[in-house]
Amino acid sequence: MFPLQLVVFPRTRLPLHIFEERYKQMVGNAIRDESEFGIVLARKDGIVNAGCTVKVEKVLEMYPDGRMDIMTRGERRFEIDGLNEEEDYLRAEVSFFDDDDAIAAPEEDREKAIRHYRTLNELGTARNHSEPDLQDPQLSFQLAQAVPDLDFLSVLLRQRSEAGRLKELIHYLSGYLPKQKAIERMKELAPTNGYGQKPEGL
């Protein structure tokens, strides 16, 4: 298991630079066995008890000292049942889960969420992320990867309804975007007197 300062979702892509010896071993095993490894959000007080597995899609570069650049793809969500710290890297017993229902989100919610996502990108405050698949039945995962709030993303990852996730995402962005627009406007006006003009010298 790989504790990181990020949240990954199913079917989203994540580039990683692997440099620690213990994770070189873990990723090397995953490449050799074509298996998954888990990514969980790391906090100052420990790790959250849910995450998502990834598979290595491609080794982008292998360095002479064993470091590597890889491209991974999110696979399955899980909850942690127990930890095993006997190996050099963290291992865990997990239970996999998916959505409890297959009810599609209303089309109007999908369209609104996409609009919010595009606005987030235009503001320049989006987290680095892979190109979203807007046809994904679990669209919320594709769009949420751009949100910079890791605590919110961790909650969203554990939500077991696509319709519910999309509503939570819309609600979050409906509050976040106006604040960011105001911040950007203040930055634009910072060198001026607030009216788009630079203050005159004394």
Name the predicted role of every residue range.
Residues 1-202:
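N-terminal low-complexity, acidic/polar interaction/targeting segments
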